[in-house]
Amino acid sequence: MKDIIYSLIENEKMYPEQIAIKHNTDVLTYRELNQYANKLADLIKDTKSPLIVYGHMSPFMIVGMIASMKAGCGYVPLDISMPEERINTIIEKINPDFIFNTSEHSLDSNGREIVNTETLLTDNRTVEFESKIKDQDIAYTIFTSGSTGEPKGVQIRYESLNEFTNWMVDLNKIGENQQWLNQAPFSFDLSVMAIYPCLATAGTLNLVDKTMINKPKLLNDMLEQSKINVWVSTPSFMEMCLMLPNLAETHYESLKEFFFCGEILPHKTAKMLLQRFPSAYIYNTYGPTEATVAVTSILITEAVINQYNPLPVGKARPGTQLSLAENEELIISGQCVSEGYVKDEQRSNEVFKDIDKRKSYFTGDKATVQDDLWFITGRIDFQVKLNGYRMELEEIEFHLRQIDVVKEAIVVPVYKNNKVTQLQGVVVLNDLNDDKDEQTVIHDIKQELKQAMPEYMIPRKIIFKEQFPLTINGKLDRKQIAEDVLA
């Protein structure tokens, strides 16, 4: 089994001048990555609290991650796009001794020691540092949104990270020394899917920043220059990129493998991608942050596309057990499961339990099994009750997306006095209806919905949008869409 820190030491010996991480013109070789990590680990070696790693897509953020694991304290990644109040809440909860600031933004240190990249660049020592991290130590803590408004810090052990990385290395069909693309900010655990499998196989990690996401031409230039082999992103980010007409195998011959996680992979998106890249390996994966990124996978083939709609998320990875509670809630058990939420025993006890002496996580996701494959069918908390009828918003969204003229869809419940009074369907259209007026298109959409679902589930209003906003993590921003509609 590959050990991440050991793999990096081996890579430094075998490929010292190979580029490990690249962001625009900023690059770090494997030698530089290891040496800077040793210097930072030496600086923080006596701390018992996690290292805050702050910035946006700087290669030095990964230096901070590796250094923190070598020092045995682990890290908490924070992106500069996060609101200041949220950052301060997280820092207060973690109470770190050190903050590694890789950006030009200033942070309120509140008496804590701030280390910046300049500190490492001007340190002329040669430092040999023997890694202190043990399997049971926390490798990283990633904060996710909490239903109470206070973010939850998900703690992942080093052994869980190594197990996940080895599974990804086994899934990867195209071997070592590849060019990987990472779309997700480091504060989102999808980035873990790119960082460690790439570095464990002596690849080069190419980082996509906010500017590239907002200007597809810059992304196109990066894809062409870096000759990307492995793509890791949310499905929503891929949907946006498929608007680039030359995103196809004929133009990007090097692009051979895709990994998707973080959201449901829509059937239409997968079908279009497979048409554009017929010889590529396309993986649909599923997993919550609380279970170390992803716990299932399936290779999307033409046969899978033809047989299943919606698409399955596949089979559980080795060492992980999946089961269903009575209400169809998916339960994940195994070494992948988080240690719990940092300094939050109450919320940890609500969702982390021992089943047959195995640590288990109650996901809040509804699931089903068909043909030995797992399907995610919605969220327990996406159920609403309208006029006495209980319904799944995601089921309505699924049927909206099956309509030819609909490219993407979100269903927004409208509340009055804490009660749902109506549903509104918000859709982005394909370019198939130029000759029809808005009311005709709305009528056609509702007529098609009537073929698939009861009248009471059909949204009262259909609202058109040019495009949907994405969160900083590259997912559909449901909250922003709802606020825009209800404003």
Curated annotation (Swiss-Prot):
The protein's Enzyme Commission number: 6.2.1.54
Superkingdom of this protein's organism: Bacteria
A biological process from GO: lipoteichoic acid biosynthetic process
Binding site for ATP: 144-145, 284-289, 365, 475
CDD domains in alphabetical order: DltA
Reaction catalyzed: holo-[D-alanyl-carrier protein] + D-alanine + ATP = D-alanyl-[D-alanyl-carrier protein] + AMP + diphosphate
Chief location category: cytoplasm
The keyword Transmembrane is assigned to this record: no
Subcellular localization(s) per the UniProt record: Cytoplasm
The entry's keywords: ATP-binding, Cytoplasm, Ligase, Nucleotide-binding
EC class: ligase
Keyword Coiled coil: no
Residue sites binding D-alanine per the record: 189, 293, 475
Ranges annotated as spanning the membrane: none
GO molecular function, one term: ATP binding
InterPro entries per the UniProt record, alphabetical: AA_adenyl_dom, AMP-bd_C, AMP-bd_C_sf, AMP-dep_synth/lig_dom, ANL_N_sf, DltA, DltA-like
Pathway(s) where this gene product acts: Cell wall biogenesis; lipoteichoic acid biosynthesis
GO cellular component, one term: cytoplasm
Annotated family: Belongs to the ATP-dependent AMP-binding enzyme family. DltA subfamily.
Function as written in the Swiss-Prot or TrEMBL entry: Catalyzes the first step in the D-alanylation of lipoteichoic acid (LTA), the activation of D-alanine and its transfer onto the D-alanyl carrier protein (Dcp) DltC. In an ATP-dependent two-step reaction, forms a high energy D-alanyl-AMP intermediate, followed by transfer of the D-alanyl residue as a thiol ester to the phosphopantheinyl prosthetic group of the Dcp. D-alanylation of LTA plays an important role in modulating the properties of the cell wall in Gram-positive bacteria, influencing the net charge of the cell wall.
Name assigned to this protein: D-alanine--D-alanyl carrier protein ligase
Species of provenance: Staphylococcus xylosus
